[in-house]
């Protein structure tokens, strides 16, 4: 009897394991669907867009989200930080009815090698600023065509501000304006300033352990 129960248990666990693997595969490869944009009363906004999509950029499939209450709005291409750190999921807890998507059509693009645009077969030699600038241009051209815009806005955060600056430097005619959040200007100098601040703070608070580590 114990042997039979053991066999049944192993069989059930195997079935559950296969089902979980199947669900994981579906989650990874399904085009998926975002929650629709809703007004303050929880009613879906008519004509709004909330989608997850993929197009070929720079010779590979790259993923992005587009969200807007009105497709006629000006378009923003958001460049996340990292490199390699898509940020849309972090925005959800802070979303209000006065969200950016009320006034703009926002494209949250997962850059080459990040999030939905990750692929283990990516050639490491393509992971360059030059290629990512070209990817940004192609993503921009897609948005201009789709929403019938001559120019769009470019917004970057952290690493995305560097990518954004390099992009508008090369393709200024594509953009109405650039918005930098946590703008990178001189990374080495920024790190020197941060180091001096941390060391001074550790000394003032008599944190000998931190001082020892920082002075190595």
Q: Over which residues does each language-model region extend?
A:
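Short amphipathic alpha-helix adjacent to the substrate-entry channel of hydrolases
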Residues: 90-107
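A short loop-to-beta-strand scaffold at the N-terminal edge of the catalytic core in hydrolase folds
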Residues: 56-68
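A catalytic-pocket lid/entrance helix-loop region that shapes and gates access to the active site
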Residues: 164, 173-216
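Short beta-strand element of the alpha/beta-hydrolase
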Residues: 73-82
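Glycine-rich "HGGG/HGxG" loop immediately N-terminal to the catalytic nucleophile
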Residues: 88, 111-127, 189
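Gly/Ala-rich beta-loop-alpha elbow adjacent to hydrolase catalytic centers
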Residues: 156-160, 164
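N-terminal type II signal-anchor transmembrane helix
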Residues: 3-35
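Conserved acidic catalytic loop of the alpha/beta-hydrolase fold
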Residues: 131-151
